[in-house]
Each structure stands twice: as structure tokens, then as C-alpha cells.
């Protein structure tokens, strides 16, 4: 299994999961040109993409979905409510490429066993994903205003966790956003803070989670260094030695790297 965050942040999101010969884009929230450039960087031919799986209908996750599906004849997977919400936003998609799933029920795309799960965000029916194959498991969990025991159970034991660390609460409160937007971000239907991500990871460490990529950082209310330092310190303060975990931050405007599992 291989995972590459191509772009991650409040301005656009797209990652690729490769299991065996199966290549799956998770969201396509950048322009087609930008996604093509990133795929070239990680050595994936867009003609060999097997699917796009969509987390929710916000523009920073679907901007390139329609373009890519039409140009490369790629199936697009989303639940019914997300399809209904995003259809007017992405243009026509061929009927044979419209695929739906039910949250909580696994499905297969080639070599990948995928389970979509509910998250808490102000979208029609947002999901995260668990990808299994090749003896490994990746959990993709962004755009969630809170984490609960159900999400902890889903993430437990993951070989790699792609986890939102959207904002520093103090930066957000002091920043230029209007109050209603600040309130939305801080709500249970908003985004996960650095501190909340750290607290969540402390509970996951005993389950075997050791590799974590922090994701979906806000441009205005966070920095890579602040997110990394806050989460790292939470783990260290909990008595977890640094040598026992791998922690990094997904980049906003360039490929973060290639992670083999």
C-alpha cells in the first residue's frame, strides 16, 4: 500500500492511495492542471486512475472531480446525499461513472477494501475512509469538528492515520474572520483544532497507531510548525517517547511525500 498527500489545506485537498494495481484519488479539490502536476511528481499516470472517492461536497474537495472524471473516464464514488449536493457543482458525469455507497458498509475498488464512515462537519453527509489492502490499513479523517469513541474505534490500530489539525484556537480567535465563521469552525460541525488532534492521538497510541500525518491546515489560523509542535508536545507530555512515533504535516501546495506501508 502507498499513500501520497498531493495537496492538503483549506484551499484544496487531494490524495492518492495505491493498493496493488489500484489507484484511487481521495477528493479532487484542486484544478485539473494542479492535480496532473502532482500525479506526475508521484509517478502515477492519470489514465491508470481507477476511481475518485469523495468525502463531501465543499469546493476545496470537489473542484477537479468533474473535470477529471470526464477527461479520463473515471468512476466517482460518494454517498447519495453528497451526490445530490455536488452534482450541480461539478458538471455532467457519465451515468456509468456515478457510483454510490452506504456509510458504514465496505465496498471494493480493485484491490482496495474501503469503508466510509460518518464524520461531523457542516456538509450534506460527510465521510472519512478506511482503506485496507496488502496487509495494511490507512484511515483518512479530515473535516470533522469533533472526534468521538466511534471514530477512535475506527482509527485504532491504523498503520497510517491522516488526521485533521486545522487550526490553532488562539490564532483563530484573534484572527480576522467574522464571528459567525469563527463560531462555525469551533463548533462540532466545524474543524478539528491542533489541541483536539493531540488529545485524540494520545488515546490512539495504546492501540498501535504510530504513523500520523496532520492534515487540512488553515492558511490563516495555523502553521505547519505550530500544528506539529502542539501535537508532538501533547504526545511527549503524555509520556510517549518521540522515537516511538512518526509525525509529519501535509503540505498545502505541494506533494508531501510517498508513504509505503
Question: Where do the PLM segments sit?
Answer:
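Cap/insert and terminal regions of metallo-dependent hydrolase folds
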Residues: 149-248
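Active-site neighborhood of phospho(di)ester-bond hydrolases with catalytic His/Asp-centered motifs
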Residues: 26-29, 50-57, 77-80, 139-142, ...
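Metallo-beta-lactamase
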Residues: 80-128, 132-135
Amino acid at each position: 500500500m502507498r499513500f501520497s498527500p498531493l495537496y492538503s489545506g483549506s484551499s484544496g485537498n487531494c490524495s492518492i492511495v495505491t493498493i496493488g494495481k489500484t489507484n484511487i484519488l481521495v477528493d479532487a479539490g484542486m484544478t485539473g492542471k494542479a492535480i496532473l502536476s502532482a500525479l506526475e511528481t508521484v509517478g502515477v499516470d492519470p489514465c491508470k486512475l481507477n476511481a475518485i472517492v469523495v468525502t463531501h461536497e465543499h469546493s476545496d474537495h470537489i473542484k477537479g472531480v468533474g473535470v477529471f472524471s470526464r477527461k479520463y473516464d473515471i468512476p466517482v464514488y460518494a454517498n447519495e446525499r453528497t451526490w445530490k449536493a455536488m452534482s450541480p457543482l461539478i458538471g455532467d458525469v457519465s451515468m456509468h461513472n456515478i457510483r454510490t455507497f452506504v456509510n458504514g458498509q465496505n465496498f471494493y475498488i480493485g484491490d482496495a477494501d474501503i469503508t466510509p464512515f460518518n464524520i461531523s462537519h457542516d456538509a450534506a453527509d460527510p465521510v472519512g475512509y478506511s482503506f485496507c489492502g496488502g496487509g495494511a490499513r490507512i484511515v483518512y479523517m479530515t473535516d470533522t469538528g469533533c472526534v468521538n469513541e466511534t471514530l477512535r474505534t475506527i482509527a485504532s490500530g491504523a498503520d497510517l492515520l491522516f488526521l485533521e489539525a486545522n487550526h490553532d484556537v488562539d490564532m483563530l480567535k484573534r484572527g480576522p474572520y467574522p464571528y459567525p465563521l469563527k463560531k462555525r469552525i469551533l463548533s462540532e460541525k466545524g474543524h478539528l483544532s491542533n489541541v483536539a488532534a493531540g488529545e485524540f492521538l494520545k488515546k490512539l497510541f495504546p492501540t498501535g497507531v504510530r504513523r500520523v500525518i496532520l492534515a487540512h491546515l488553515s492558511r490563516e489560523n495555523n502553521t505547519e510548525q505550530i500544528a506539529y509542535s502542539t501535537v508532538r508536545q501533547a504526545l511527549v507530555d503524555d509520556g510517549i517517547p518521540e522515537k516511538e512515533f512518526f509525525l509529519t504535516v501535509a503540505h498545502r501546495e505541494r506533494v508531501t511525500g510517498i508513504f509505503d506501508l
